[in-house]
Amino acid sequence: MSGPNGDPDISAEGIIEDEDEFNEEEYAAIDSMLDQINSCLDDIEERNDALNGKLQELLESNRAARRDFRQQITDHADLPPPANDDDEDEQSRDAQKKD
């Protein structure tokens, strides 16, 4: 018969019980592995913090560049457009045709 979640009914046999004993060597090995994992996680956290700092600097630099670019566009929008050499050549040709 299955349980309330559809899981099969499993007997308690084969399940680790609190009575199981680990010797000191096994505890030391587990402790060593946990220390290594902790060290790796600390290293990952440091790298993550460094990358986050660099990304924040890049983001601020990008914002400043966009702000400067917008300001340049605004400043240049107030100026008349530069004369185009093609327009002058066309006007010269039109004047020559009339003569």
UniProtKB/Swiss-Prot annotation:
Which biological process terms from the Gene Ontology are attached to this UniProt entry? intermediate filament bundle assembly
Coiled-coil residue spans: 34-71
UniProt-annotated location(s)? Cell junction; Cytoplasm, Cytoskeleton
* Chain intervals for the UniProt region annotation (Disordered): 66-99
GO CC terms? anchoring junction; cell junction; cytoplasm; cytoskeleton; subapical part of cell
Report the GO molecular function annotations: molecular adaptor activity
Record protein name field: Bublin coiled-coil protein
Q: Which gene encodes it?
A: bbln
